[in-house]
Design a protein with these regions (language model features):
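N-terminal donor/sugar-recognition subdomains of glycan-related enzymes
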Residues: 1-242, 248-249
Length: 249
């Protein structure tokens, strides 16, 4: 079994139906660029993308491994629940560093705009260990119902206000050039999510005292309110009554 086949099985285990959605996406593929696999001078696989007459490398042609190692060292002290929102998986070295060298359980959300790049990356890394160790979500444009417009539900869960100081958005090299609009859109979605959570928190704090005061002021009406007294004496005190009601009242 190849690494690619093993990864498809692993993904299907955690996300049922992923294998079917990947096969369908491959069949319906309509991407207007070419993916070329090369080797860097240090022997690591590197992707070159040809798009609109231009070529971009997603990893270093001379030394592909060292930049990812230095990146991990620069991350400092991580902790359980730290979240990476990554744009791209074209340089698999960044994900590999997190899987192999971070023992804390991380949340790793990877948005990949290209099906071709995603499928090629599945040939280079065994995901089984990483999926057991961390929460890894692949959000690949065009596979199943996954689109950038629908990633908000994922961002809402990992970008709660109490976790914002443990969230990092990381855009892999040259993705801002190859997928400029997707990059700008993801950045804006993250900013909007963080802002909305902050506003909701501030609103809750500001009105928490007012809510308490309102409850105390209106407590005296509970005993005489219509909904409180409408069943009074309707059911005899010495009889068991069953009230069937719909709604919070």
């Amino acid at each position: 079994m190849t690494i690619y086949e093993k990864n498809i099985q692993t993904l299907s285990k955690y996300y049922p139906g992923m294998d079917y959605n990947i096969d369908k996406a491959k069949h319906d593929l309509k991407e207007n660029y070419t993916i070329i696999e090369e080797k860097s001078k240090d022997g690591m696989p590197v992707l070159k993308v040809k798009k609109d007459g231009h070529c971009c490398y997603l990893g270093g042609k001379r030394n592909a491994q060292k930049p990812t190692e230095e990146w991990l060292k620069a991350q400092g002290d991580l902790c359980d629940g730290y979240t990476y929102i990554m744009l791209g998986i074209g340089n698999i070295g960044y994900l590999r560093e997190l899987i192999e060298h971070v023992d804390f359980r991380l949340n790793i959300i990877i948005y990949e705009p290209s099906i071709q790049i995603f499928l090629k990356s599945l040939e280079w890394i065994d995901l089984e260990k990483g999926m057991k160790k961390h929460l890894i979500i692949f959000w690949v444009e065009g596979i199943g119902l996954m689109t950038l417009d629908r990633i908000g539900s994922v961002l809402d869960k990992v970008m709660r206000l109490e976790n914002l100081n443990k969230v990092q958005l990381f855009i892999l090299p040259n993705y801002d050039i190859l997928f400029e609009k997707k990059c700008e859109s993801l950045v804006k979605k993250c900013e909007d999510t963080a802002f909305e959570n902050r506003v909701n928190y501030n609103t809750a704090v500001k009105f928490s005292n007012i809510d308490s005061i309102n409850v105390m002021k209106n407590a005296k009406y509970l005993c005489t309110a219509y909904k409180t007294i409408q069943l009074y004496k309707t059911i005899p005190f010495d009889t068991t009554g069953i009230v069937v009601a719909a709604g919070p009242s």
